Amino acid sequence: MVTQKRTHYEIFWEILTFCKTPKSFTSIINRCNLNSKIGQRNLEFLKKRKFLLQVEEEGAVLFQSTEQAKQYTVLFSKTYRELFDNSPEFRL
């Protein structure tokens, strides 16, 4: 079975969906199956676009999706369903 590479848009959706509650960098790259360099680049991009907020909780740096990110995740899900007749899902 041939698997296709995920697009940036799918990766952004996965990160933003996973970060609805604050998450650590390590948990994000592990859950979204990213290497550190690409993960850092994606998080910086999403922070610059104000889709992701960096917060500190009990001395730990965490990332959380913003209200603005919700618009992206909803639109992406809708478009994905129209194109592929199913919902985007996390890869496990």
Located regions from the model:
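Short capping segments at the starts of secondary-structure elements
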Residues: 19-24
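Amphipathic alpha-helical dimerization/coiled-coil segments
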Residues: 74-92
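Short amphipathic alpha-helical interaction segments
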Residues: 34-48
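Short alpha-helical segments that sit at the start of domains
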Residues: 1-13
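Basic, amphipathic "hinge/linker" alpha-helix immediately C-terminal to the N-terminal HTH DNA-binding motif
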Residues: 59-76
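A short, conserved structural fragment
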Residues: 47-57
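A short acidic, leucine-rich amphipathic alpha-helix
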Residues: 27-31
